[in-house]
Regions:
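Class I SAM-dependent methyltransferase SAM/SAH-binding core
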Residues: 1-43, 78
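Conserved SAM-binding loop
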Residues: 11, 52, 92
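A short acidic, Gly/Pro-enriched loop at the edge of an enzyme's catalytic core
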Residues: 41-55
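A short SAM/SAH-binding and catalytic strip from SAM-dependent methyltransferases
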Residues: 52-71
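Short "lid" loop at the C-terminus of a central beta-strand within the Rossmann-like core
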Residues: 60-61, 95-100
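A short glycine-rich, Lys/Arg-flanked "PGG" loop and its adjoining helix->strand segment in the class I
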Residues: 69-86
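Conserved beta-strand signature within the Rossmann-like core of class I S-adenosyl-L-methionine
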Residues: 86-94
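Class I S-adenosyl-L-methionine
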Residues: 98-114
Length: 114
């Protein structure tokens, strides 16, 4: 995305190791890209409406495989909804089938496309 002209990209990961590795890897060529440690279930450090676009690539799948999966998935999507700007876009890349995932989205997002 950065190489396509998108800037001010914030990447959030729950792994300190991943964040440190990626910060080192991108520091010279992607000056406006940030990697931050965080948990998508509680993104209190981010303001409501802070992001125009949120992309999830497999995080929902991981959350649904863990303990307290259903409540945590709802917390995650609630937080994404909160930090997403009005008319913002949420893109979720998931291996789950449409019907099993749809129930999580209808509570938080007006338009859902599968």
């Amino acid at each position: 995305m950065y190489e396509d002209g998108y800037e001010n990209i914030t990447n959030i990961d729950i792994s300190h190791t991943c964040v440190k590795f990626m910060e080192e890897r991108i520091k010279e060529r992607c000056k406006n890209m940030k990697y931050k440690y965080g948990n998508v279930i509680d993104m209190a450090e981010y303001k409501s409406g802070e992001f125009n676009v949120v992309i999830d690539k497999g995080t929902l799948d991981s959350v649904l495989c863990g303990d307290n999966s259903e409540p945590n998935a709802e917390k995650m999507l609630s937080e994404i909804h909160r930090v997403l700007a009005p008319n913002g876009v949420f893109i979720c890349v998931t291996y789950g089938d449409d019907e099993s995932r749809k129930k999580y989205f209808v509570s938080f997002f007006f338009l859902t496309f599968f």
